[in-house]
Amino acid sequence: KPGLVENHKDLNALVKEIDPTRLTTMAHVSMVPLDSRLHGITDLESYNHYFGWYGGKYTDNEKWLDNFHEKHPEICLGLSEYGAEGIITYQPDEPKCRDYSESYQAEYHEHMAEILMARPYLWSTHVWNMFDFGCAARNEGGTAGRNNKGLVTLDRKIKKEAFYLYKAYWSREPFVHMCGRRYAQRPGDADR
C-alpha cells in the first residue's frame, strides 16, 4: 500500500489525467509542517488555522501566513478554515479567547478580515462557518451538540456582530449596524 504522500500524488495525477485543465487543491491542518512532503503536490494549497481560538493568539495568523509565504513563495496559499465561536447571550465586559462570546468572535473576525485583505498572495479565504450547526460530539461553551462558529445562529434568525463586518466588506448594499446592542446590561455607572 502506498503511503499518504504517494496516495496524494496518485490522486493528483488521476485528476490531471481526467481533466488537465482543472486545478487541484489540498487542505492541511495547522500541524502540517512547513517542510512537509505534502507541499507542492497540488496546484493550490490551503490551511485550516484557528490561531486565536484553539491555541495561540489571533495575531499568530499573520506571522504564520507571512512565514509560510516567505519559505514557499511558489505555492498558491489559501486559508480553508478560520473562525471563533460566538454565542449571542455571552456578552462579557472584556472579551477574551475561548470565552465563547459574540464580542470576542467579532473582535477575532475584525482582525482576520484586516490581515487577510492585506495579503494579496492568498488565493482564497473561507470563514468557518456561515451558520452555527449541529455536531453531536461537541460540548463546548455550555451548548452541547452545536458548533457556534457561524456568523448567523443555528435557527438562521439572528445575524451575529461578525456577520455585519463581512457584509460591510463584501456587499455594495448601503446599511447601518449598531454594534453591541445585545450587550445591554453593562457593569459600572449608568451614565458611562
Task: Please provide the spans of the model-predicted regions.
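Extended substrate-binding grooves/exosites of carbohydrate-active enzymes
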Residues: 1-192
